[in-house]
Amino acid sequence: TGTTPWDTVVCFTYKINGLKVNDHNKLLKNAKFRLYSDENCTNEVYVKESPNGYVVMNRDSLGGTDHTGGARPSSAVEMASDAKGVFTILGLDQGTYYLKETDSPAGYRELLDPIVITIKPTFTDERNNYNAGEGATDKTLKTLEATAHVKEFLDGAYKENDTDLKTDVTVGSANITVVNYVGTKLPITGSNLTMICLGAGTITVVCALALNEKRKNKKD
């Protein structure tokens, strides 16, 4: 009779250490976020609160597969930065995610597009040398790469940046800083105050034109 060869399967999950600041490095509280697994932001990666941050919830037990299908769990929450601007996401698989800001702190411009985060690990080829309990060491997880693609709408134009995130292979984490810019929200973000200011400016111009026309008529 034959024998089944020994095989070692090592599964890792990863962590994102998020920090929310303004363009002067002031820590921002209560910026709201949701995480998605698709570009259109229709398949939400549900998370629940824990003492250490927000933990990804597996949809398998909810009638779905990975991050699609199934019912929304009652314990799923929207993420928010704390008083120190921190939000931590735990239990992520490798792959691409879309971090969408759903609400910015008062007085700041909300990000219009989701941040595209890609997590790419490299594992050892010496799988049989792994011993249970070794965790993220050079025997198992050799490298961890993470990138962020950010679109910003500034000065009337889009700017796109690709950034290599700082990672820690020993704990499987990546650090990302999300920036909100100071200033009144532009009309594209739905700021009523800006619309009122623009309306007042239009009225002023119309009144000035009417006054000039009246003066011309008197001279004639």
Range-by-range predicted roles:
Residues 1-220:
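Solvent-exposed loop/turn and edge beta-strand elements of beta-rich ligand-binding domains
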